[in-house]
Protein backbone atom coordinates (compact mmCIF):
# COMPACT_ATOMS: atom_id res chain seq x y z
CA UNK A 1 0.00 0.00 0.00
CA UNK A 2 1.28 3.45 -0.94
CA UNK A 3 0.05 6.45 1.03
CA UNK A 4 0.70 10.01 -0.07
CA UNK A 5 -0.60 13.04 1.79
CA UNK A 6 -1.75 16.33 0.22
CA UNK A 7 -0.53 18.26 3.28
CA UNK A 8 2.11 17.40 5.87
CA UNK A 9 0.62 19.71 8.51
CA UNK A 10 -1.86 17.08 9.69
CA UNK A 11 0.93 14.52 10.08
CA UNK A 12 2.98 16.97 12.14
CA UNK A 13 -0.09 17.56 14.30
CA UNK A 14 -0.51 13.82 14.90
CA UNK A 15 3.14 13.50 15.91
CA UNK A 16 2.77 16.43 18.32
CA UNK A 17 -0.38 14.90 19.83
CA UNK A 18 1.04 11.38 20.26
CA UNK A 19 4.79 10.77 20.31
CA UNK A 20 5.56 14.33 21.43
CA UNK A 21 2.50 14.86 23.62
CA UNK A 22 4.71 15.13 26.71
CA UNK A 23 7.27 17.49 25.17
CA UNK A 24 7.54 21.00 26.58
CA UNK A 25 5.37 23.64 24.96
CA UNK A 26 5.59 25.71 22.90
CA UNK A 27 6.89 22.94 20.64
CA UNK A 28 8.62 23.97 17.41
CA UNK A 29 8.80 21.48 14.54
CA UNK A 30 9.86 21.80 10.92
CA UNK A 31 9.52 19.49 7.94
CA UNK A 32 10.11 19.10 4.22
CA UNK A 33 9.06 16.56 1.63
CA UNK A 34 6.88 15.78 -1.38
CA UNK A 35 3.08 15.86 -1.20
CA UNK A 36 0.42 14.87 -3.72
CA UNK A 37 -2.49 17.23 -4.34
CA UNK A 38 -5.91 15.58 -4.53
CA UNK A 39 -6.71 17.67 -7.58
CA UNK A 40 -4.74 19.98 -9.85
CA UNK A 41 -5.65 23.57 -10.66
CA UNK A 42 -5.18 25.72 -13.73
CA UNK A 43 -2.37 27.78 -12.23
CA UNK A 44 -0.41 24.73 -11.05
CA UNK A 45 -1.46 21.67 -13.10
CA UNK A 46 1.21 19.43 -11.59
CA UNK A 47 -0.12 17.31 -8.73
CA UNK A 48 3.13 16.43 -6.95
CA UNK A 49 4.91 19.28 -5.21
CA UNK A 50 7.46 19.94 -2.49
CA UNK A 51 6.22 21.28 0.83
CA UNK A 52 8.48 22.98 3.39
CA UNK A 53 7.16 24.31 6.66
CA UNK A 54 7.33 24.92 10.38
CA UNK A 55 4.77 24.63 13.16
CA UNK A 56 4.66 26.21 16.61
CA UNK A 57 2.43 24.06 18.82
CA UNK A 58 0.90 24.97 22.16
CA UNK A 59 -0.22 28.53 21.51
CA UNK A 60 -1.83 30.59 18.77
CA UNK A 61 -1.16 33.98 20.35
CA UNK A 62 -0.24 36.99 18.24
CA UNK A 63 3.36 36.61 19.49
CA UNK A 64 3.46 33.05 18.13
CA UNK A 65 1.88 34.17 14.86
CA UNK A 66 4.43 36.99 14.58
CA UNK A 67 7.29 34.51 14.97
CA UNK A 68 5.88 32.19 12.33
CA UNK A 69 5.23 34.95 9.78
CA UNK A 70 8.70 36.41 10.37
CA UNK A 71 10.46 33.05 9.98
CA UNK A 72 8.61 32.37 6.72
CA UNK A 73 9.52 35.78 5.30
CA UNK A 74 13.17 35.34 6.28
CA UNK A 75 13.20 31.89 4.66
CA UNK A 76 11.94 33.33 1.37
CA UNK A 77 14.38 36.23 1.53
CA UNK A 78 17.21 33.83 2.35
CA UNK A 79 16.42 31.99 -0.89
CA UNK A 80 16.73 35.26 -2.80
CA UNK A 81 13.02 35.95 -3.28
CA UNK A 82 12.05 39.62 -3.47
CA UNK A 83 8.85 41.50 -4.20
CA UNK A 84 7.13 39.53 -1.43
CA UNK A 85 3.48 40.21 -0.61
CA UNK A 86 1.80 38.87 2.54
CA UNK A 87 -2.00 38.76 2.50
CA UNK A 88 -3.65 38.51 5.94
CA UNK A 89 -7.09 37.01 6.52
CA UNK A 90 -9.44 36.19 9.40
CA UNK A 91 -10.80 32.78 8.31
CA UNK A 92 -13.53 32.34 10.94
CA UNK A 93 -14.65 35.97 10.92
CA UNK A 94 -18.13 35.31 9.51
CA UNK A 95 -18.77 32.49 11.99
CA UNK A 96 -17.64 34.74 14.85
CA UNK A 97 -19.90 37.62 13.81
CA UNK A 98 -22.85 35.38 12.97
CA UNK A 99 -22.73 33.85 16.45
CA UNK A 100 -22.43 37.27 18.10
CA UNK A 101 -23.16 40.86 17.13
CA UNK A 102 -24.43 40.14 13.57
CA UNK A 103 -26.69 37.07 13.85
CA UNK A 104 -27.37 34.90 10.81
CA UNK A 105 -29.58 31.88 10.38
CA UNK A 106 -27.47 28.73 10.20
CA UNK A 107 -28.57 28.20 6.59
CA UNK A 108 -27.27 31.65 5.63
CA UNK A 109 -23.75 31.39 7.05
CA UNK A 110 -22.37 29.34 4.16
CA UNK A 111 -23.89 31.50 1.39
CA UNK A 112 -22.72 34.69 3.08
CA UNK A 113 -19.19 33.28 3.36
CA UNK A 114 -19.20 32.27 -0.31
CA UNK A 115 -20.34 35.69 -1.54
CA UNK A 116 -17.80 37.49 0.62
CA UNK A 117 -15.02 35.32 -0.79
CA UNK A 118 -16.27 36.07 -4.32
CA UNK A 119 -16.64 39.79 -3.47
CA UNK A 120 -20.20 39.50 -4.80
CA UNK A 121 -21.91 42.55 -3.33
CA UNK A 122 -25.07 42.05 -5.36
CA UNK A 123 -25.35 38.43 -4.32
CA UNK A 124 -24.91 39.42 -0.69
CA UNK A 125 -27.71 41.99 -0.88
CA UNK A 126 -29.96 39.42 -2.55
CA UNK A 127 -29.67 37.21 0.54
CA UNK A 128 -31.53 39.77 2.65
CA UNK A 129 -30.90 42.55 5.14
CA UNK A 130 -28.99 40.40 7.65
CA UNK A 131 -26.54 39.32 4.95
CA UNK A 132 -26.30 42.82 3.46
CA UNK A 133 -24.99 44.07 6.81
CA UNK A 134 -21.75 42.23 5.95
CA UNK A 135 -21.13 44.41 2.87
CA UNK A 136 -18.50 46.64 4.58
CA UNK A 137 -16.23 43.59 4.86
CA UNK A 138 -15.87 43.55 1.08
CA UNK A 139 -14.64 47.14 1.24
CA UNK A 140 -12.18 46.27 4.03
CA UNK A 141 -9.94 44.58 1.46
CA UNK A 142 -6.74 45.81 -0.13
CA UNK A 143 -3.49 47.49 1.03
CA UNK A 144 -3.11 46.68 4.72
CA UNK A 145 -3.24 50.06 6.44
CA UNK A 146 -6.15 51.46 4.42
CA UNK A 147 -8.08 48.19 4.74
CA UNK A 148 -7.46 48.12 8.48
CA UNK A 149 -8.91 51.61 8.85
CA UNK A 150 -12.08 50.45 7.09
CA UNK A 151 -12.22 47.31 9.24
CA UNK A 152 -11.82 49.42 12.38
CA UNK A 153 -14.64 51.72 11.26
CA UNK A 154 -16.85 48.67 10.66
CA UNK A 155 -15.93 47.30 14.09
CA UNK A 156 -16.83 50.57 15.78
CA UNK A 157 -20.33 50.16 14.37
CA UNK A 158 -20.79 46.73 15.94
CA UNK A 159 -19.54 47.62 19.39
CA UNK A 160 -15.86 46.68 19.08
CA UNK A 161 -16.42 42.93 18.77
CA UNK A 162 -13.26 42.62 16.66
CA UNK A 163 -11.03 44.91 18.73
CA UNK A 164 -8.82 42.10 20.03
CA UNK A 165 -8.30 40.63 16.56
CA UNK A 166 -7.60 44.02 15.02
CA UNK A 167 -4.99 44.74 17.70
CA UNK A 168 -3.41 41.34 17.05
CA UNK A 169 -3.24 41.98 13.29
CA UNK A 170 -1.47 45.28 13.89
CA UNK A 171 0.96 43.61 16.30
CA UNK A 172 1.80 40.89 13.75
CA UNK A 173 2.30 43.46 10.99
CA UNK A 174 4.42 45.86 13.05
CA UNK A 175 7.84 44.12 12.77
CA UNK A 176 7.47 43.31 9.07
CA UNK A 177 9.88 45.38 6.98
CA UNK A 178 8.75 48.11 4.62
CA UNK A 179 10.16 46.11 1.70
CA UNK A 180 7.32 43.63 2.20
CA UNK A 181 3.89 44.48 0.77
CA UNK A 182 1.04 43.82 3.20
CA UNK A 183 -2.57 43.36 2.18
CA UNK A 184 -5.74 42.37 4.01
CA UNK A 185 -8.67 40.25 2.86
CA UNK A 186 -10.56 39.59 6.10
CA UNK A 187 -13.10 37.12 4.69
CA UNK A 188 -10.89 34.98 2.41
CA UNK A 189 -11.58 31.29 3.06
CA UNK A 190 -10.08 29.47 0.07
CA UNK A 191 -7.45 27.02 1.42
CA UNK A 192 -8.10 28.28 4.96
CA UNK A 193 -10.93 25.90 5.82
CA UNK A 194 -9.26 24.52 8.95
CA UNK A 195 -7.60 27.73 10.16
CA UNK A 196 -9.13 29.63 13.06
CA UNK A 197 -8.68 33.32 13.82
CA UNK A 198 -5.68 34.18 11.61
CA UNK A 199 -4.36 33.13 8.22
CA UNK A 200 -1.89 34.44 5.65
CA UNK A 201 -0.69 33.79 2.11
CA UNK A 202 2.61 34.59 0.40
CA UNK A 203 3.02 35.90 -3.12
CA UNK A 204 6.12 37.12 -4.97
CA UNK A 205 6.68 39.25 -8.04
CA UNK A 206 7.23 37.16 -11.15
CA UNK A 207 5.28 34.15 -9.87
CA UNK A 208 1.69 33.21 -10.58
CA UNK A 209 -0.38 32.25 -7.55
CA UNK A 210 0.64 31.85 -3.95
CA UNK A 211 3.99 30.36 -2.96
CA UNK A 212 3.00 29.63 0.62
CA UNK A 213 0.36 30.00 3.29
CA UNK A 214 -0.19 29.49 6.98
CA UNK A 215 -2.22 30.40 10.01
CA UNK A 216 -3.64 29.35 13.36
CA UNK A 217 -5.48 26.07 13.90
CA UNK A 218 -6.21 23.38 16.50
CA UNK A 219 -4.71 19.92 16.94
CA UNK A 220 -7.04 17.22 18.23
CA UNK A 221 -5.51 14.93 20.87
CA UNK A 222 -6.59 11.29 21.39
CA UNK A 223 -8.44 12.32 24.57
CA UNK A 224 -10.48 14.87 22.61
CA UNK A 225 -8.57 17.90 23.86
CA UNK A 226 -7.89 20.65 21.31
CA UNK A 227 -4.45 22.25 21.34
CA UNK A 228 -3.79 25.60 19.61
CA UNK A 229 -1.02 25.86 17.03
CA UNK A 230 0.23 28.14 14.28
CA UNK A 231 2.45 27.37 11.31
CA UNK A 232 3.27 27.89 7.65
CA UNK A 233 3.91 25.87 4.51
CA UNK A 234 5.95 27.01 1.52
CA UNK A 235 5.68 25.44 -1.94
CA UNK A 236 9.11 26.09 -3.43
CA UNK A 237 8.90 24.22 -6.76
CA UNK A 238 8.33 27.39 -8.86
CA UNK A 239 11.27 29.03 -7.06
CA UNK A 240 13.54 26.04 -7.54
CA UNK A 241 12.60 25.80 -11.23
CA UNK A 242 14.05 29.26 -11.89
CA UNK A 243 17.11 28.83 -9.69
CA UNK A 244 16.20 30.49 -6.39
CA UNK A 245 18.03 29.12 -3.36
CA UNK A 246 20.79 27.53 -5.39
CA UNK A 247 24.34 28.09 -4.28
CA UNK A 248 27.38 27.48 -6.43
CA UNK A 249 29.62 24.97 -4.65
CA UNK A 250 32.84 26.38 -3.23
CA UNK A 251 35.61 24.25 -4.72
CA UNK A 252 39.14 24.46 -3.37
CA UNK A 253 42.23 22.80 -4.87
CA UNK A 254 44.47 20.87 -2.48
CA UNK A 255 48.06 20.71 -3.77
CA UNK A 256 50.38 17.78 -3.20
CA UNK A 257 51.53 17.65 0.42
CA UNK A 258 48.62 19.75 1.68
CA UNK A 259 47.63 19.92 5.35
CA UNK A 260 45.15 17.01 5.72
CA UNK A 261 43.61 18.32 8.96
CA UNK A 262 43.01 21.74 7.42
CA UNK A 263 41.41 20.07 4.39
CA UNK A 264 39.12 18.09 6.70
CA UNK A 265 38.12 21.29 8.47
CA UNK A 266 37.33 22.97 5.14
CA UNK A 267 35.03 20.11 4.18
CA UNK A 268 33.27 20.61 7.50
CA UNK A 269 32.74 24.25 6.53
CA UNK A 270 31.05 23.23 3.29
CA UNK A 271 33.95 23.43 0.84
CA UNK A 272 34.24 20.90 -1.98
CA UNK A 273 37.87 19.81 -1.92
CA UNK A 274 39.74 18.55 -4.99
CA UNK A 275 43.08 16.94 -4.11
CA UNK A 276 45.98 16.92 -6.55
CA UNK A 277 47.17 13.48 -7.56
CA UNK A 278 50.16 14.75 -9.56
CA UNK A 279 52.10 17.94 -10.22
CA UNK A 280 50.26 18.24 -13.54
CA UNK A 281 46.85 18.72 -11.91
CA UNK A 282 45.50 22.23 -12.43
CA UNK A 283 43.04 23.77 -9.95
CA UNK A 284 41.17 26.17 -12.26
CA UNK A 285 40.89 23.50 -14.94
CA UNK A 286 39.28 21.24 -12.34
CA UNK A 287 36.67 23.89 -11.53
CA UNK A 288 38.29 25.30 -8.40
CA UNK A 289 38.06 28.98 -7.49
CA UNK A 290 40.50 28.72 -4.58
CA UNK A 291 43.54 26.76 -3.50
CA UNK A 292 44.99 25.85 -0.13
CA UNK A 293 48.27 27.60 0.54
CA UNK A 294 49.63 26.26 3.81
CA UNK A 295 46.60 26.67 6.05
CA UNK A 296 45.13 29.65 4.18
CA UNK A 297 42.46 29.64 1.47
CA UNK A 298 43.53 31.76 -1.47
CA UNK A 299 41.74 32.72 -4.65
CA UNK A 300 43.15 32.11 -8.10
What are these regions (language model features)?
Residues 79, 85-87, 113:
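Hydrophobic alpha-helical bundle cores within soluble ligand-binding/oligomerization subdomains
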Residues 91-125:
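Short terminal or interdomain "cap/linker" segment that borders an active site or interface and mediates
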Residues 9-23, 29-81, 127-300:
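Positively charged, Gly/Ser-enriched RNA/tRNA-binding surfaces
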Amino acid sequence: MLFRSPDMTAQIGRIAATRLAGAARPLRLCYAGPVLKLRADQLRPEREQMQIGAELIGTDSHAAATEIVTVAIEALQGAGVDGITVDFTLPDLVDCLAAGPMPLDAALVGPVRARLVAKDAGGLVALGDAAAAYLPLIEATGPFHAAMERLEAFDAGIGGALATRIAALRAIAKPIGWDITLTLDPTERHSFEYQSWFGFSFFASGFVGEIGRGGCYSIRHPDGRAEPAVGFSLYPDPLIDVGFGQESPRRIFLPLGHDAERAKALRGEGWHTVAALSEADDGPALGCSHYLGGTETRGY
